[in-house]
């Protein structure tokens, strides 16, 4: 094992607790050099993601700039190659925020965290000034009727896509300059918007959860946060469903899909009947609108639906086999109707306490703004990253042709400055890239610590993922996770470790997955239920599951290793319990 990864950040004495929770879902692999350079830090200092998060906390009023190290990242760290969130900072936000707590932040964002220590107050954690500032912001959260800035950002990134230049006509240096320019101009702002809205979404979610618990109806909290509508990250699944219906209705399309995923896009584009032409027109429109989504989509070197359309076709392939009863629009409508019914009922139950009644009603309305807003702000970031990705891929193709890069995606192994250097003199860069890639590949096979307190353990002590042994769940035994989306379902467990190849998942199966970034969420539609190793109620994919109405349990630790593939299981999305019924 390599003695150390080729990049990383410092730990923090003031904020010593780091976690893979939440960030591990969106950065499952080690961080590549190019992402570290623009998002974390480089020779010039702290970079866009850290700065954007600090901007968000300052805007909320939770922290002042002098509470953070000016020279080192504090909120986002990279240890042993893996991205970590600083749980100490997020817990302090919870403690300072009126009506929240460190425990509430843990529950909403992190779910079950094996090995995480209890919150211990630091003398500087309490801040009456910060509490007052946050309180004023919270007042706005509960009264605003929309997020117009977020919609303006959406228009901006959509315009970038519409005005995408002809990368093939640009020079090598122009490609690098263009990608760096759009990231430098926009990413800090977009990421700050994302964390601003994300942090504030904890308020309505927390109020709804607390009031439901006080009324003796804790199981209804998730139902009141479901069926919100206008969730950007759920939209692709709805369009894919329609595409799947087109396939199911077209004989030539069915035949093309039945052959298998290999070469599927080429077979489809060779068809010339009316149904096939209609499908391809709709599919191309889908790729234009949602082509930025994919596995590990924050990382520019990873594939997306535009760069590898078969990733999207694989999910459509599963949906085409589903019965009409699996229509996500119908499920979403049902969740929305139930949300309205429950909301009216519970507001009525609070008639004797007008203050709480008013706050609860405001929280229900606010949840409908800030939880979809969280997904839209993330989507705005991903759209921007994707435009940079497309420029990088053109650059990578050219460097492969010139013999500088071993792979098109080798751009991920160099910084902006190094990219310019190798254009001036490519001598030796291929060897440097291959050495870094070898370390990246080696570290990707290691199981990183879920929680770090203080300094991270050396890489030499991290076990290989394939060497970790756990006991399988037997008949009648259960795994206790965290409720993600209400509902109870049964089905055969299908352990799918890679969203690139979901062909074992049949309609009515229970999807058991290690994580669920947006490339996984379309697979929720044909599934009877979803079980995930990690996650929490405010995880991105869990918000999507509540829009699609799929019973879901998250933070079911080691479920992909412990639940036998093919076992009949029951998923209880209200209690968070997954039970093996037979094997």
Language-model region placement:
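Residue-level detector of short coil/turn "hinge" positions at structural boundaries
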Residues: 219, 294, 406-407, 552
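Protease-associated
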Residues: 4, 9-12, 159-162, 169, ...
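Acidic, glycine-rich flexible loop/linker segments
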Residues: 1-12, 17, 21, 494-509, ...
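Glycine-centered helix-boundary capping/hinge motifs
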Residues: 216, 403-404, 549
């Amino acid at each position: 094992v390599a003695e150390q990864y080729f990049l990383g950040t410092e730990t923090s004495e003031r904020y010593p607790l780091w976690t893979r929770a939440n960030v591990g879902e969106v950065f499952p692999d080690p961080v590549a050099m190019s992402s570290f350079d623009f998002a974390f830090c480089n020779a010039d200092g702290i970079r866009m993601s850290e700065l954007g998060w600090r901007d968000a906390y300052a805007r909320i009023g939770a922290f002042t700039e002098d509470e953070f190290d000016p020279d080192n990242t504090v909120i986002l760290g990279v240890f042993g190659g893996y991205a970590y969130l600083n749980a100490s900072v997020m817990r302090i936000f919870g403690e300072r925020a009126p009506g929240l707590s460190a425990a509430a932040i843990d529950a909403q964002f992190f779910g079950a965290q094996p090995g995480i220590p209890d919150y211990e107050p630091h003398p500087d954690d309490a801040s009456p000034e910060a509490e007052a500032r946050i309180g004023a912001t919270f007042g706005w959260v509960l009264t605003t009727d929309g997020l117009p800035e977020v919609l303006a950002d959406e228009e901006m990134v959509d315009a970038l896509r519409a005005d995408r230049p002809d990368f093939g006509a640009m020079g090598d240096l122009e490609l690098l300059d263009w990608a760096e320019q759009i990231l430098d101009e926009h990413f800090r702002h977009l990421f700050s918007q994302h964390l601003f809205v994300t942090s504030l979404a904890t308020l309505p979610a927390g109020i709804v959860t607390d009031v439901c618990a006080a009324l003796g109806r804790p199981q209804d909290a998730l139902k009141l946060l479901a069926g919100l509508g206008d969730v950007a990250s759920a939209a692709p699944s709805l369009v894919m469903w329609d595409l799947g219906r087109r396939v199911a209705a077209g004989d030539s399309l069915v035949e093309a899909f039945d052959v298998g995923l290999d070469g599927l896009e080429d077979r489809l584009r060779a068809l010339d009947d009316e149904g096939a032409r209609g499908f391809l027109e709709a599919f191309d429109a889908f790729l234009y609108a949602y082509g930025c989504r994919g596995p590990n989509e924050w990382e520019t070197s990873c594939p997306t639906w535009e760069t590898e359309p078969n990733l999207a076709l694989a999910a459509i392939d599963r949906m085409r086999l589903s019965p009409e009863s699996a229509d996500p629009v119908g499920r979403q409508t049902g969740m929305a109707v139930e949300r309205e019914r429950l909301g009216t009922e519970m507001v009525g139950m609070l008639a004797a306490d007008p203050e709480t009644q008013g706050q609860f009603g405001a929280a229900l309305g606010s949840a409908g703004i800030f939880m979809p807003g969280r997904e839209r702000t993330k989507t705005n970031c991903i759209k921007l990253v994707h435009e940079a990705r497309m420029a990088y891929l053109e650059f990578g193709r050219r460097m492969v042709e010139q013999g500088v890069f071993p792979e098109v995606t080798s751009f991920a192994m160099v910084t902006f400055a190094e990219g310019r250097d190798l254009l001036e003199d490519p001598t030796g860069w291929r060897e440097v890239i291959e050495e870094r890639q070898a370390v990246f590949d080696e570290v990707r096979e290691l199981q990183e610590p879920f929680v770090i307190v203080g300094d991270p353990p050396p890489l030499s002590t991290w076990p290989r993922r394939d060497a970790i042994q756990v006991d399988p769940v037997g008949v009648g035994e259960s795994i206790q996770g965290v409720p993600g989306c209400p509902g109870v379902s049964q089905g055969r467990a299908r352990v799918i470790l890679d969203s690139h190849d979901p062909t074992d998942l049949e309609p009515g199966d229970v999807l058991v997955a290690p994580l669920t970034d947006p490339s996984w969420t379309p697979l929720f539609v044909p599934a009877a239920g979803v079980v995930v190793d990690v996650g929490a109620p405010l995880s991105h994919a869990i918000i999507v599951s509540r829009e699609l109405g799929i019973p879901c349990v998250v933070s079911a630790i080691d479920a992909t290793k412990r639940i036998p593939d093919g076992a009949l299981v029951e998923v209880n999305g209200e209690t968070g319990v997954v039970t093996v019924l037979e094997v």
